[in-house]
Amino acid sequence: MTIWVDADACPKMIKDILFRAAIRTNTNLILVANSYLTYPNSPFIRSILVEKGYDRADHYITSHMKAKDLVITADIPLAAEVIVKQGLAMSPRGELFTANNIKQRLTLRDINEQLRSAGERTGGPSALSAKEKTSFANALDRWLAKNK
């Protein structure tokens, strides 16, 4: 099993949790981004640099991931594609995206996008809280325990 990270928008504190977990459990961790990333020197961690452009990292992840791989992303359309490919998608806040909740999340995203197009200010996500960081770490540990 591999953990893929949509790394451009992933918070540093979440990447740090992922680095420690990958090293501790000997789990492959692949960061995909369109900018250079720094990460610990480990045989289990690597970075893929994709061209700058719309959804380049997303396309790389979905074309290289395998069923049952874990993808860390806040990108709802990417999460939906991961689910279609039989992978597991988790947000940096520890929320698991599933076949049962992804349609609702896509609908909400589309509504917010329509509001933004009409000039409404919908705001972005709030800063990651300590509780959400813990929630992510716990969800990751559960996945690792199940899949190692």
Curated annotation (Swiss-Prot):
Provide the leader sequence positions: none
Family annotation (Pfam families) = DUF188 (PF02639)
What domain of life does the UniProt record list for this protein's source? Bacteria
InterPro entries listed in its UniProt record: UPF0178
Q: Tell me which family the UniProt entry assigns to this protein.
A: Belongs to the UPF0178 family.
Q: What is this protein called?
A: UPF0178 protein lpl0088
**Organism per entry:** Legionella pneumophila (strain Lens)
Q: What is the lineage of its organism?
A: Bacteria, Pseudomonadati, Pseudomonadota, Gammaproteobacteria, Legionellales
